[in-house]
Amino acid sequence: MNNTFKYVNEDVSGTEGEESDYDPSEFIRGYHESPRSPRLIDYEMGRGLMGNFKGLGINKVRQSNEYDNDTDYSSRKSSKIINDVIHGHMEVPDYIMDFIDTEQFQRLRDLKQVGTTSFVFPCASHSRFEHSIGVSHLAGKYIDRIKVTQPELEITEREQKFVRIAGLCHDLGHGPFSHAFESWVDQLGGSKRFHHEDMSIKMLNWIIDDHGLDEYDSDDIKFISSLIQGKHRPKERAFIYDIVANNRNSVDVDKFDYLSRDSYYLGRSTVCDFQRLMEFSKVIDDQICFLSKEIYNLYELFHTRYSLHKLVYTHKVGKSIEFMIADAFTEADQFLKISDQLEDPKEFINLSDSLLRRIETSKEPELEKSRKIIKNIRNRNLYKFVDEIIVSTDKIRWSADSLAEDIAKVGNGILESDIIVQNLKLNYAFKDKDPVQSTRFYTRYDSTQSFTIKKEETSHLIPNQFQEERIRIFCRSKEKCEQVQTAFRKLLKNHNLSPNPSFTVSPARNIKKI
């Protein structure tokens, strides 16, 4: 096999239940009888968020114009109510439905949120479709709350609307198996580059052009695109750009939703309470700041992210399958021209997780090698995890792209193409920095001034380092696992390094299915 996927540099930096415990009196704030809102929304009582109204003797609520006093809703189509396992009953405005009811957005149903992790955790089969709707819901809820609690900011309906749209469309550009696809494109080399955020903006433009959404002009699209990327923020009103994609400290509603949603479907509990973060925050000097006592909640947010990456998203079996899918795509690329469909959204729309099944059921002889790899995935004949080492930057004595070559030289009968080197970085979404140190806080006693809090003033149990680097070795040939492991450990010994004992697998186990 002409292998181009020899090593992987993976950096998981941010740059990718059923009922909520709401206080009813808090929830109905913003809903009241209004002669300007003729739409009457009936909610099923007895479960979810609206069940809390029963004790108040309220069976029907009318949507408030509190957030949009200058809007005539009588001419608008009805919004929809979606019952979500994470956020309960979500009201989806008609302008959001205009985007949802398109083939470009519906494609997200065929993109699993956790990529190849679903091969390891079978209940985690949720898609980017519901995640994107959830992010839109939280984005709207967040900016609506800021508008109500801080009217002096004069947040416009346009800003509220576009923040929701940005939350909805931020993942439109993901490819098959999400981040695994981006890694595969990077390994192709040459001029091939792919960033899902850029494709998301292309898909957004296509939706607007293709479906006659003429109310959005070029300035509107530019604004929404900046919200998706979290870039090109002006000095004034910079806080609006922190809601969906926060490049300032990585605290955003995208993270709120996927950490909660993934944990739910993975059967894992999460300690972070993102509802409190939204409730106890305010804008000071054009930056979203948090109540000082929420600093522990913020650390829980980033620790939850780190734990999911370490234990779930980078699970060795999931990564093994990811490498096999990458090899299958590489073998199929010359025939299917997958890498030629990365620029035009009208071609890219055909790339989803179903590409695997498309290859698997094909009859073309040109796809035989790819079909064989996919068959091995189905039969659980996977690439084998050989070894892992945790390293410090100052102790690395080789580059990742030369390690496979070094192992092949030391070993007997080992080819470079037998080896996959994964260079993995795990962190708090801010590379090697503490994201909380880039976050500002306020106190109840003076909510007009913001400040930072040193971690030494918070707790001595907060880590001193915020990024760890690991080197993992996988082998494509189960017959050569023992030789690869022996050669790798010889290299480690030469560099005064030792493998990670918690992940070390004996050669005898290596030849079994994982």
UniProtKB/Swiss-Prot annotation:
Zn(2+) binds at H131, H170, D171, D254. Gene3D superfamilies: 3.30.70.2760, Hypothetical protein af1432 (1.10.3210.10). GTP binds at K80, D101, T102, E103, Q104, F105, Q106, R107, L108, R109, R380, K384. SUPFAM superfamilies: HD-domain/PDEase-like (SSF109604). GO terms for cellular component: nucleus. InterPro entries: dGTPase-like, HD/PDEase_dom, HD_assoc_2, HD_domain. It holds the Pfam family HD. The active site is at H196. Homodimer; in absence of GTP and dNTP. Homotetramer; in GTP- and dNTP-bound form. This is Deoxynucleoside triphosphate triphosphohydrolase SAMHD1 homolog. It comes from Dictyostelium discoideum.
